[in-house]
Amino acid sequence: MDDDIQAVVIDNGSGMCKAGFAGDDAPRAVFPSIVGMPKHLGIMVGMNQKDAYIGDEAQAKRGVLTLRYPIEHGIVTNWDDMEKIWSHTFYNELRVAPEEHPVLLTEAPLNPKANRERMTQIMFETFNVPAMYVNIQAVLSLYASGRTTGCVLDSGDGVSHTVPIYEGYALPHAIVRLDLAGRDLTDYMMKILTERGYSFTTTAEREIVRDIKEKLTYVAMDFDEEMEKSTRSSALDKTYELPDGNVIVIGNERFRTPEVLFNPSMIGRECSGVHECAFQTIMKCDVDIRRDLYSNVVLSGGSTMFPGIGERMTKEVIKLAPTAMKVKIITPPERKYSVWIGGSILASLATFQHMWISKTEYDESGPSIVHRKCF
């Protein structure tokens, strides 16, 4: 690899795609992982209509489009759409020729083998990249926090995972996947705001609710106490101005929304809360490394951005952990993008340069090379 050619780092999430260049401290492009297809062909007279819109443009024109999310629960389910997103990333967002840059991609923990192969194949055959590599998202988040051992709780828009990592390697047998993340919280908030008499139903309105969620919600230290406080006074109420100028009042929805992460039964799910997932993950690991994991629980992803989540998580994990165990929850301020940042760090390390899968290796071995080189 030439030293002067920057690698491209792409973190494809269920909700947002983060892309940029290795060595940078933040992604240059962050856009929704959405592909929009026109509902009715030729409806906009005089508009030179495209056959597909990606990301923010799809979002802006969502009224006349059918929106699709090619990544569901962290796993790619529609490869044609995924290819469109990658193409948009290279040519429109980063404005680079993919055949000139090595590409580091991220994948969800427990990503099916066939998916990694498909990813590899598209990169080499469709985009002709000179080299590529695939890494697990949670591992990159841990690197970004300056650690090689820890338990990562990564919660994004489509899926959450707790992943134990020891000396840089994820321990797959102990990974816990939780199909509960930002999108479910937005849905729940839409529901409870509707119960309050505000109507949020369309995909456009869902984006408004997502914005309310990101700006005004927080995690209560003690849910019942907070509920009581909110019934007694309106001190917790906040106002939010809708795009049409109307102002709505948000009350206990502010902390009821993220509470779902700790108590999924609120939305009728029988799964464990995020604190129990972290505990289960640690308990599935060798007894000798548990102490290291308990003292290095790193939060990452957009759905860990709620104020108060670190304190609440500490309180809940201490309740589950053995007495006298030191529990430390780390909430890096840049955790919304820590997967991408970890990728940027990794791809710019001198020691990483021999790890890339080169085009030559791919041509010799085919897509299955990814299992031998990326683990």
From Swiss-Prot:
Molecular function GO terms recorded: ATP binding; hydrolase activity
* UniProt xrefs under Pfam families: Actin
What Gene3D superfamilies does the record tag this protein with? 3.30.420.40, Actin, Chain A, domain 4
Highest taxon in the source lineage: Eukaryota
Q: Which reaction does it catalyse?
A: ATP + H2O = ADP + phosphate + H(+)
Q: Name one GO cellular component term.
A: cytoplasm
**Primary location:** cytoplasm
**What is its EC class?**
hydrolase
**Catalytic activity, EC:** 3.6.4.-
Sorted alphabetically, which keywords does the UniProt record give? Answer: ATP-binding, Cytoplasm, Cytoskeleton, Hydrolase, Nucleotide-binding
User: What SMART domains would the database entry show?
Assistant: ACTIN
What is the tissue specificity? ACTA and ACTB are actively transcribed in mycelium, sporangia and germinating cysts but only at a low level in the case of ACTB.
Q: Where in the cell is it found?
A: Cytoplasm, Cytoskeleton
What does it do? Actins are highly conserved proteins that are involved in various types of cell motility and are ubiquitously expressed in all eukaryotic cells.
Which family would the database say this protein is a member of?
Belongs to the actin family.
Can you say what this protein is called? Actin-2
Which gene codes for it? ACTB
